[in-house]
Amino acid sequence: VQKRTIIMEKKMAGFCIFFLILFLAQEYGVEGKECLNLSDKFKGPCLGSKNCDHHCRDIEHLLSGVCRDDFRCWCNRKC
């Protein structure tokens, strides 16, 4: 009975390690890396992320935009 328990514990440990590796591999999947850059053309203080996002997408043709604590518009682009 003790041998059977040890074998089952080893199988369970291997099973857990396999799924841990599988989970971590998903986290580092094949996605394009994104970089956050200060907008070149946004004028004035950035008070609403909706305006910044619209500007980055439609005017600078980038992925998205967000206002940060420095009241400037930052755009996301692929690196």
UniProtKB/Swiss-Prot annotation:
Keywords: Allergen, Antimicrobial, Defensin, Disulfide bond, Fungicide, Signal. Belongs to the DEFL family. It comes from the Eukaryota. It holds the Pfam family Gamma-thionin. Probably has antifungal activity. InterPro entries: Defensin_plant, Scorpion_toxin-like, Scorpion_toxin-like_sf. SUPFAM superfamilies: Scorpion toxin-like (SSF57095). Residues 1-32 form the signal peptide. GO terms for biological process: defense response to fungus; killing of cells of another organism. The keyword Signal applies. It comes from Arachis hypogaea. Disulfide bonds join 35-79, 46-67, 52-73. This is Defensin 2. May form dimers. The keyword Cytoplasm does not apply. Not glycosylated. Has 4 disulfide bonds. Gene3D superfamilies: Knottin, scorpion toxin-like (3.30.30.10).
